[in-house]
């Protein structure tokens, strides 16, 4: 039997106490019922924001981990654009593929053919989590190919998922990857073969067309924006990957990613390391630059005893965060995966989104509400 044995529990079958342990309230509903204006600003106009949230309680019982999920409007059939959260699967799949190739490791130097930037796999993964670097992600997609990336996720139970394109790149949906020039040592290089992937088919989901208009280059098109060929990575899949990353032993062997201990330690370190710790300018890349829950609406330093292992995404007016939050001082840990649309004018690609005014403050306060609940929750 694994060290940790997963026990699947659904919120619907549980009697869960509120913060004061005096009622059977759903704690997520309790948080969303807050009178805080940062919460009310969204909850009072819920339909326009397409909110989906999964809050996961974590309990330890003898040698078992118990996950208890509480969902709000979570539905894999209701599409949202995952943006940079799709970099998380790319990072994990890259580590697993590296573990299968004897001549490569995290510190192997390489560059993409036609690109002047020489890097390492470790640097790409660090940049993905610290500042959500698009180019770093795209280099990993060239290494993997879309088909292999998706297969690796599905094989481990991370589903549904369909990563179809690179991010913020010309020909982002090109099905043929670019070769990588890899340094086998200081004087010897090898060139990988291009990978031909399966062309993406249009997604048949609700809310796949959004808004009332969009800009194509500099031209305003008076029609909903069509996301049917975009990446698809819903809340359920994001939660599944996060759980398998933080608590691999809670899953059967066939659902664990094949990472060695060095790789796993590196991944976890990358997920919680703050930008200034990697040498980024703290004025621009402050502690909570890509930590939306609890701290996203402040540029103040984050407390040392709270670590957030996460991946955010923001594009097309959609904010998403997938996070494991750990308070080592108070022995509290929990997970939140949430997404919100903030595009009040209904026009996409106009760069007029309410990220800072509505979206990030909502996610930050949601994190604070659930954190306060966790501090008082009986275990």
Regions found by a protein language model. Name each.
Residues 96-123:
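Short, well-structured active-site flanking segments
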Residues 17-18:
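C-terminal motif of bacterial Sec signal peptides marking the signal peptidase cleavage site
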Residues 87-94, 128, 153, 238, ...:
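Residue-level preference for non-acidic, small/hydrophobic
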Residues 2-10:
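Sec-dependent signal peptide recognition
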Residues 24-36, 48-49, 116-255:
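Active-site-adjacent helix/loop patches that line small-molecule binding or acyl-intermediate pockets
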Residues 36-74, 336-338:
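A short, well-structured edge-of-sheet supersecondary motif
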Residues 21-40, 223-235, 239-379:
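Structured C-terminal helix/loop/strand segments within mature extracytoplasmic catalytic/sensor domains
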Residues 80-105, 336:
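Active-site SXXK
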């Amino acid at each position: 039997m694994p060290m940790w044995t997963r026990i699947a529990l659904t919120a619907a079958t549980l009697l869960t106490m509120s913060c004061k342990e005096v009622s059977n309230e759903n704690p997520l509903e309790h948080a969303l019922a807050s009178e805080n204006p940062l919460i009310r600003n969204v909850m009072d106009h819920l339909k326009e924001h397409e909110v989906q949230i999964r809050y996961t309680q974590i309990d330890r019982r003898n040698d078992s981990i118990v996950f208890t999920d509480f969902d709000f409007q979570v539905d894999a059939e209701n599409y949202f654009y995952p943006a940079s959260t799709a970099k998380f699967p790319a990072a994990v799949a890259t580590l697993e593929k590296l573990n299968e190739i004897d001549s490569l490791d995290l510190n192997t130097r390489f560059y993409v053919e036609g690109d002047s930037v020489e890097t390492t796999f470790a640097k790409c993964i660090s940049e993905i989590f610290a500042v959500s670097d698009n180019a770093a992600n795209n280099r990993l997609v060239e290494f993997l190919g879309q088909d292999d990336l998706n297969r690796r996720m599905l094989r481990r139970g991370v589903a549904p998922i369909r990563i179809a394109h690179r991010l913020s790149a010309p020909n982002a949906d090109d099905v043929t990857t670019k070769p990588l020039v890899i340094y086998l040592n200081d004087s010897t290089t090898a060139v990988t073969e291009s990978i031909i992937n399966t062309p993406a088919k249009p997604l048949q989901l609700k809310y796949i067309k959004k808004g009332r208009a969009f800009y194509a280059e500099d031209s305003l098109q008076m029609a909903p924006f069509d996301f049917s060929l975009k990446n698809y990575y819903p809340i359920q899949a994001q939660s599944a990957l996060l759980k398998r990353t933080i608590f691999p032993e809670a899953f059967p062997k066939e659902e664990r990613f094949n990472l060695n201990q060095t790789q796993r330690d590196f991944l976890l370190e990358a997920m919680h390391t703050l930008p200034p710790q990697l040498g980024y300018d703290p004025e621009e890349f402050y502690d909570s630059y890509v930590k939306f829950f609890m701290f996203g609406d402040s540029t103040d330093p984050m407390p040392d005893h709270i670590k957030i292992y996460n991946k955010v995404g923001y594009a097309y007016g959609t904010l998403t965060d997938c996070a494991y939050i750990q308070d080592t001082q108070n022995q509290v840990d929990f997970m939140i995966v949430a997404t919100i649309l903030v595009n009040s004018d209904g026009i996409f690609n106009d760069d007029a989104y309410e990220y800072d005014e509505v979206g990030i403050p909502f996610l930050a306060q949601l994190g604070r509400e659930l954190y306060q609940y966790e501090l008082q929750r009986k275990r």
